[in-house]
């Protein structure tokens, strides 16, 4: 009973942290204390209704903190972070990435500008991603907070979604040739090993010097297969973390972000 209460308390605290980070990402506001409590309460309720602060995503935020923390990753302060989200699907995690990497690495530092690019072959999924992100922005607009990207602030986030083959990414103008973070959430190597070999090879090649590739997996065995394939392609698995708050899904042994791995390119 005490354990359940502790877990409930941890998730509630995690939701508060996530709401505060999302406020920062979309409006550029600083600490939560700068906003009236009634505004924060309204935002929390709206974000909960949208599904953006459900338990699965609170656990995902905490998993990012743990996995990247273990490899000594430190966000810049007042800098820029480029993120490529491959096979992003409807990309419910898009706002999470923006909020996470936008947080300053130091106590006195300013917010980071996050340039995030989501890519998926499936055009319908990309349209869902665009609508979802726009709907989340509308929540903050409805709460009376001006959106950071609509201001002249240089820290405004840039978020774009593309329906195309990732290997043709370099054909788009204004997109970096390499990224600080290349992310694949819920990789699916079981679906088509040859196709995923190509995706992993491209992902590793798109990592900037000193950057990271991060993957999460639904299944234990599939995660191990993915890591072996990444190693064969020249990746170094720096850390692999089991998610202690993973949310069970629709098949035995399947759960959201069951494992997370942080990978570097071998020198």
Task: Describe each PLM feature range.
Residues 8-76:
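Class I SAM-dependent methyltransferase Rossmann-like catalytic core
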Residues 180-194:
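A short SAM/SAH-binding and catalytic strip from SAM-dependent methyltransferases
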Residues 122:
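Conserved SAM/SAH-binding beta-strand->alpha-helix loop
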Residues 210-218:
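Conserved beta-strand signature within the Rossmann-like core of class I S-adenosyl-L-methionine
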Residues 90-111:
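Conserved SAM-binding loop of SAM-dependent methyltransferases across substrates and taxa
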Residues 171-182:
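A short acidic, Gly/Pro-enriched loop at the edge of an enzyme's catalytic core
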Residues 195-209:
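A short glycine-rich, Lys/Arg-flanked "PGG" loop and its adjoining helix->strand segment in the class I
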Residues 130-172:
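S-adenosyl-L-methionine
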